[in-house]
Amino acid sequence: MASQKKQLFKIIILGDSGVGKTSLMNQYVNARFTQQYRATVGADFMAKEVMIDDRMVTLQIWDTAGQERFQSLGGAFYRGADCCVLVYDITNPKSFDSLDSWRDEFLMQGQPKDPEHFPFVVLGNKLDKATERKVQESKAQQWCKSHGNIQFFEVSAKDATNIEQAFQDIAKAAASQEKDEEIFFPTTVTLTKQSQKPQAKQGGCC
């Protein structure tokens, strides 16, 4: 059997409404920021090509609604994900406290094959408002450590601080799952027509 590496990785972004999930995605994919976003209804996604280990792959980044009334739709969007990004707002302690419930919900509804080793990345957004900080970086680092040494970045969707580095690590985390999920194809067999010699007619007596 021959194997082929995946060319598309599905990334899910989760977090409370208002933490900046859409802004993060738009800053990374389009290098743009606006204050005019409306709350995401259901889910939406953007795609971006990125180099990982000297090969080009596509990240399909899903931005999901943070409102409770849409959480029942999660399973349909979470399944098949290669990495889950948990986002909170460093000026909003409640959004940080919600990380546990978002992580648990993803594991329950997304049903990854290996939940203990599934890659999560935590982003503390709105670093541009550091003077209004309510969640200390050390507290977030401790949370990540206690949940399996989850990768962690403080970022700003507004001024792009740490966005590129964070998503590079997100892409690598997604690709790390390939060893367990390689796509296998049957070995190719070439079929050729063999020339058939006409069989001699057998004579018979009437």
Curated annotation (Swiss-Prot):
Record's bilayer topology term: Peripheral membrane protein
Pfam families: Ras (PF00071)
Triggers of expression: Expression increases two-fold during phagocytosis (at protein level).
GO terms (BP aspect): endosome to plasma membrane protein transport; lipid catabolic process; lipophagy; phagosome acidification; phagosome maturation
PROSITE patterns recorded: RAB (PS51419)
Family as reported in the entry's similarity comment: Belongs to the small GTPase superfamily. Rab family.
Entry's Gene Ontology cellular component terms: autophagosome membrane; cytosol; late endosome membrane; lipid droplet; lysosomal membrane; phagocytic vesicle; phagocytic vesicle membrane
EC number: 3.6.5.2
CDD domains recorded: Rab7
Lipid-anchored residues (S-geranylgeranyl cysteine): 205-206
Gene3D superfamilies: P-loop containing nucleotide triphosphate hydrolases (3.40.50.300)
Function noted in UniProt: Small GTPase which cycles between active GTP-bound and inactive GDP-bound states. In its active state, binds to a variety of effector proteins playing a key role in the regulation of endo-lysosomal trafficking. Governs early-to-late endosomal maturation, microtubule minus-end as well as plus-end directed endosomal migration and positioning, and endosome-lysosome transport through different protein-protein interaction cascades. Involved in lipophagy, a cytosolic lipase-independent autophagic pathway. Plays a role in phagocyte formation and acidification.
Reactions performed catalytically: GTP + H2O = GDP + phosphate + H(+)
Top-tier EC class: hydrolase
Motif Effector region positions after renumbering to this chain: 37-45
Subcellular location: Cytoplasmic vesicle, Phagosome membrane; Late endosome membrane; Lysosome membrane; Cytoplasmic vesicle, Autophagosome membrane
Entry protein name: Ras-related protein Rab-7a
Phosphoserine PTM positions: 17, 23, 72
Keywords: Autophagy, Cytoplasmic vesicle, Endosome, GTP-binding, Hydrolase, Lipid degradation, Lipid droplet, Lipid metabolism, Lipoprotein, Lysosome, Membrane, Nucleotide-binding, Phosphoprotein, Prenylation
Annotated positions of the Phosphotyrosine modification: 78, 88
Underlying gene: Rab7a
UniProt binding sites for GTP: 15-22, 34-40, 63-67, 125-128, 157-158
Main location: membrane
GO function term, MF aspect, one: GTP binding
Modification type Phosphothreonine: residues: 34, 40, 64
Organism: Paramecium octaurelia
